[in-house]
A protein has these predicted regions:
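Generic secretory/membrane-interface signal
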Residues: 4, 17, 42-44
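Bacterial N-terminal signal peptides that target proteins for export
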Residues: 2-12
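Acidic, low-complexity Ser/Thr/Gly/Pro-rich repeat segments typical of extracellular/periplasmic
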Residues: 27-141
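A detector of low-complexity, intrinsically disordered, Ser/Thr/Gly/Pro/Ala-rich segments
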Residues: 1-4, 19-20, 134
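Bacterial N-terminal signal peptides
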Residues: 11-23
Length: 141
């Protein structure tokens, strides 16, 4: 019984060492991962959003490729009316979409999907898909 336990513990230690070495060899860190959305305005899941806001902002974890985006609509009735072209702020992490919103409406926008991957960092890695959903209020605050 004691011999089996010793062999078992050695196997566990060996597997842990392989895992640690492999993880280090791969260089797993934030710098070599694909970009992710770290914030949106309005926030995803927000209710009673002021329909008078004129832009949607999405901020990524790293600098992004200019003039490359995928604001993907699921259904036309849930996508905002666009006013001009998207653009990045000087930080190259925040993309602005000028919009016209309607009161008491649900908006659903994918930022990248499996099929549309044009939100990319400066190294060309596509951002992880992100679902932005929010509802506007009646506009009477």
């Amino acid at each position: 019984m004691r011999m089996k336990l010793t062999v078992y513990l050695r196997c566990i230690v060996a597997l842990a060492a392989v895992f640690i070495i492999t993880g280090s060899a791969l260089g797993l860190n934030l710098e070599n991962q694909p970009p992710v959305v770290v914030g949106t305005v309005p926030e995803s899941g927000a209710k009673n959003v002021d329909p008078a806001i004129r832009e949607i902002r999405v901020t990524f974890s790293t600098k992004m490729m200019d003039k490359s985006w995928s604001w993907v609509q699921i259904a036309p009735e849930n996508f905002p009316d666009l006013v001009g072209e998207p653009r990045y702020l000087e930080d190259k992490k925040t993309c602005i979409l000028k919009v016209r919103l309607e009161p008491e409406k649900t908006y659903i926008i994918w930022l990248n999907t499996q099929r549309y991957t044009n939100f990319k960092d400066t190294d060309g890695r596509p951002a992880q898909p992100y679902l932005l959903m929010f509802e506007t209020g009646n506009g009477k605050f």
